[in-house]
Amino acid sequence: GTTAMLRKHHIPYAVAFAQVKPGAAKLWPWNPWERPSWSGASHVFHQTEESLALWTRAGYRNGFLAGDGRFDQVGQRPAPEGLEVFTDHRPVLVVGSSWQKEEALLLPLLMRFPELKVILAPHDVSRVDSLDSQLPVPRVRWSKFESYTSESQAEARVLLVDSLGDLPALYACGHLALVGGAFGPGLHNILEPLVHGLPVVCGPKVQGHWEASDSEAPVTILPMDATPETLATWIKKRLENPPLRFKEAEQAKIFIAKHRGASQRVWEVLSL
C-alpha cells in the first residue's frame, strides 16, 4: 500500500482528522497488517478526546488532539436573493437531503402548521416529480422560482429544491432543520444548518457524526419508530416558544465557533 511505499523510501507522513471507534481493527495489538502503517506515521491527529484516548490506550505514541477539520470547511453562505416574498417573515423549516422516511414524517404535518413555510430538498432530485404530486399545499420549484408571480411565491407553502449545490445557502433562510439520511444509510451534513443557527432534528443512525450526539449542539435525535406526531411535537415546541429557538440558534453558532481551527492546529504542529 501507499504507507508501505512511504516507509520503504523513508518519506515521513501524517494522518489528519482520525476518528477511532472502540473495537476498531487498527487498535488490535495483534494486527500486523494495519499497525505498522499507523505507527509509522509521524503524527495521527484525532478529532475528539475519546478517539485519542482509545489510540493511546492501544499503545500508539503518535497521537495528537486537533479537532474536526469539517468545521473549518463549512461556510456561512448568504441566503439566495429574492426569497423574501416566499418566506414572508414566517418560520421556515428546511428539510435537507431528505429520504422517504423524513418525507413521510413531514407531509402529514403541512396542513397542521399553516404558518410554517418549508424548503424541501430531497437527497435524490430525480424524485422531485413524485414528491410534487404528494404535496397537499401550494408549492413552487427552485429551478423556476424567478418565473413565478410574486403572488404564487407568497402563496406557496413549500419550495421544492430540484437542483444540486444550493442547499447550504438555503439553510440561511431557515429557522429549523430536519436533516435526512439517519433513518436509512446514515446522517447527512448537519454542520451546514448549524452554522446558520438552525436547531436540527434527525433520525438515529448518526454513527460517524459525533457532533450529532454532542450535548452542546442543539440536535434532537428521533427514534427509528418516530411518527409524524413525534416530529410535530418537536416543531410545535419551537414554534410556540421563540425564546427557545433563539437560545438554540445561539447554541449552534457557539458550537461551530468552538470547534473551528483544527486545520490550523495540524499545520502549526507539522511546521515545528
Tell me the role of every PLM-derived stretch.
Residues 1-272:
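Nucleotide-activated sugar donor-binding and catalytic core shared by glycosyltransferases
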